[in-house]
From Swiss-Prot:
Family named by the database record: Belongs to the UDP-glycosyltransferase family.
InterPro entries, A to Z: UDP-glycosyltransf_plant, UDP_glucos_trans, UDP_glycos_trans_CS
Statement: the UniProt record of this protein carries the keyword Ion transport: no
PANTHER family linked to this entry: GLYCOSYLTRANSFERASE, UDP-GLYCOSYLTRANSFERASE 708D1-LIKE
UniProt region (UDP), positions on chain: 279-280
Glycosyltransferase found in the keyword field: yes
Keywords tagged on the record: Glycosyltransferase, Transferase
Active-site residues, Swiss-Prot/TrEMBL: H32, D129
Binding locations of an anthocyanidin: H32, G381
Name of this chain's protein: UDP-glycosyltransferase 708C2
Reactions this protein catalyses: a 3'-hydro-2'-hydroxy-beta-oxodihydrochalcone + UDP-alpha-D-glucose = a 3'-(beta-D-glucopyranosyl)-2'-hydroxy-beta-oxodihydrochalcone + UDP + H(+)
């Protein structure tokens, strides 16, 4: 069966004027879905004008995924939807449900050729999540597969190095030629355990990255210059294909206007702190209360997205009960407590002057695009290395120690980031560089145009 599949997709030769047909294969969870929706939208629009098929992994886990996918296809009628069903294992105690889904996708990727064989016109290339790397690169070796990583170039380097990392101890920083060392505190502990579910599918896919046509990253040249240079020089990981920055990707426009915009319109410029820890970071009730008391004492206006569960369907908390009546009233007098916002609209408003963030990579790129300074409070996964990138690039500061306690530290850190003109100017510079990269003729826009152009030769 595998032998037949590998010959079913010969490389497609197009004339200069033909429209390439590309398949975009997203992974799981909002952190993976959002950049893939942005990529699909970008590829289908001018100046790239590809015919796009967007592969959606079924079943979905969160309500947010369902909502975004439905909205996306309503606003992009020319993009074809292709569902790819995987079998989810039964929930396991103390195992992240997203890890289970990631593994099911990785284990099912070898079945993709059967689904792709139904598509017309012939496929010119695939842009796929890291989770599909082994399955696509072994079953469709003649079809160009661009692996799209949804994290920073620096953390992607670490993921690519996991096959070696899992054999080592965690006692000393990880050194990869051409790059600053990776402190062990920044590395997810599972990476040192080859038997961990997350590490096992990371190793399986990392071992086949060399067969990808290229690695595309939602970053830009001036944001991670040392990492990109080291990867493309061949000094760091010599078996990798070209690593191509194409970000920050254009973001989707939402039909529904953010309900908090009228409130923001009434606030002074750069006076509001936006607080969000992403779609998968659920804080404990004690952490939430400590942060709430700190924000109340900081005397700063804010918008805070409060999340108490990794999966939105499971979040049944009532904010008034969570904070208690007295603290809830005090917080509501100074800011807004919500469970969801349109983050890009919030960050783009002139009243927003800072972002207390977990440093998920989508959030970092959205802040970079708008020049909003970040106070980094990474929680898990890639976030500590992303915070390292944020600080090095001049977009924000990473306060590594909260020794005085969350409540006291929040007061200090919030006042620092909201009143630091040097940091604000540096973040504005990053925003200008991001805009130049994705404008016509910029480094990221040109890189993506070159990829599409190569499909026509």
């Amino acid at each position: 069966m595998m032998g037949d599949l590998t010959t079913s997709f010969p490389a497609t030769t197009l004339t200069t004027n033909e429209q390439p047909h590309v398949v975009v294969c997203s992974g799981a969870g909002m952190g993976h879905l959002i950049p893939f929706l942005n990529l699909a939208s970008t590829l289908s629009s001018a100046p790239y004008r590809c015919k796009v098929t967007l592969l959606i992994v079924i079943p979905l886990i969160t309500d947010a995924e369902s909502h975004h996918i439905s909205s996306f296809f309503s606003s992009h009628p020319t993009i074809h939807r292709l569902d790819f069903h995987v079998n989810l294992p039964a929930p396991k105690p103390n195992v992240d449900p997203f890890f289970l889904r990631y593994k099911s996708i990785s284990d099912s990727a070898h079945r993709l050729p059967v689904h792709l064989s139904t598509l017309a016109p012939p496929i010119s290339a695939v842009f796929s999540d890291f989770l599909f790397t082994q399955g696509l690169n072994t079953t469709l070796p003649h079809l160009p597969n661009y692996t799209f990583t949804t994290t920073s170039a620096r953390f992607f380097t670490l993921m690519s190095y996991v096959p070696h990392l899992a054999k080592s101890s965690s006692s000393s920083p990880v050194e990869i030629p051409g790059l600053e060392p990776f402190p062990t505190d920044n590395i997810p502990p599972p990476f040192f355990n080859p038997d961990h579910i997350f590490t096992s599918f990371t190793i399986s896919n990392a071992n086949y990255l060399s067969l990808s046509k290229g690695i595309i990253v939602n970053t830009f040249d001036s944001f991670e210059p040392e990492t990109l240079s080291a990867l493309n020089s061949g000094d760091s990981l010599p078996d990798l294909p070209p690593v191509i920055p194409i970000g920050p990707l254009n973001e989707l426009e939402h039909n529904k206007q953010e309900e908090l915009l009228p409130w923001l319109d009434q606030q002074p410029e750069k006076s509001v702190l936006y607080v969000s820890f992403g779609n998968r970071t659920a804080m404990s009730s004690d952490q939430i209360l400590e942060l709430g008391m700190g924000l109340e004492r900081s005397d700063c206006r804010f918008i805070w997205v409060v999340k108490t569960s990794k999966i939105d369907k499971d979040d049944k908390s009532e904010l008034r009960k969570l904070f208690g009546e007295e603290l809830y009233v005090k917080l509501s007098e100074k800011g807004k407590l919500v469970k969801w916002v349109n983050q890009t609209e919030i960050l783009g408003h002139t009243a927003v002057g800072g972002f207390l963030s977990h440093c998920g990579w989508n959030s970092v790129m959205e802040a970079a695009r708008r020049g909003v300074p970040i106070l980094a409070w990474p929680q898990h996964g890639d976030q500590r290395e992303n915070a390292w990138v944020v600080e090095k690039a001049g977009l924000g500061v990473w306060e590594r120690e909260w020794s005085s306690g969350i409540q006291v530290a929040i007061v200090e850190k919030v006042k620092m980031i909201m009143g630091n003109n040097d940091l604000r100017n540096s973040a504005v510079r990053v925003g200008e560089e991001a805009k130049r990269a994705c404008d016509v003729g910029g480094s990221s826009a040109t890189a993506l145009m070159n990829i599409i152009g190569s499909l026509k030769r």
